[in-house]
């Protein structure tokens, strides 16, 4: 799903779309560029 894609691709657009979801909190933040790091 879109959150899996965000984790896999570390896409800022996808991070925005699934920001504040648990998978982004745990798996994307810290891997993506600001403001999602």
UniProtKB/Swiss-Prot annotation:
Quaternary structure and partners: Homodimer.
UniProt keyword annotations, A-Z: Disulfide bond, Pheromone, Secreted
Subcellular location: Secreted
UniProt-recorded name of the protein: Mating pheromone Er-20
Cystine crosslinks: 3-18, 10-32, 15-24
Biological role stated in the UniProt entry: Mating ciliate pheromones (or gamones) are diffusible extracellular communication signals that distinguish different intraspecific classes of cells commonly referred to as 'mating types'. They prepare the latter for conjugation by changing their cell surface properties.
UniProt keyword Secreted, yes or no: yes
The keyword RNA-binding belongs to this UniProt entry's keyword annotation: no
An MF annotation (GO) of this entry: pheromone activity
A GO CC annotation given for this chain: extracellular region
Organism: Euplotes raikovi
């Amino acid at each position: 799903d879109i959150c899996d894609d965000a984790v896999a691709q570390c896409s800022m657009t996808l991070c925005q779309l699934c920001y504040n979801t648990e998978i982004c909190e745990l798996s994307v933040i810290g891997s993506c560029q600001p403001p999602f790091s």
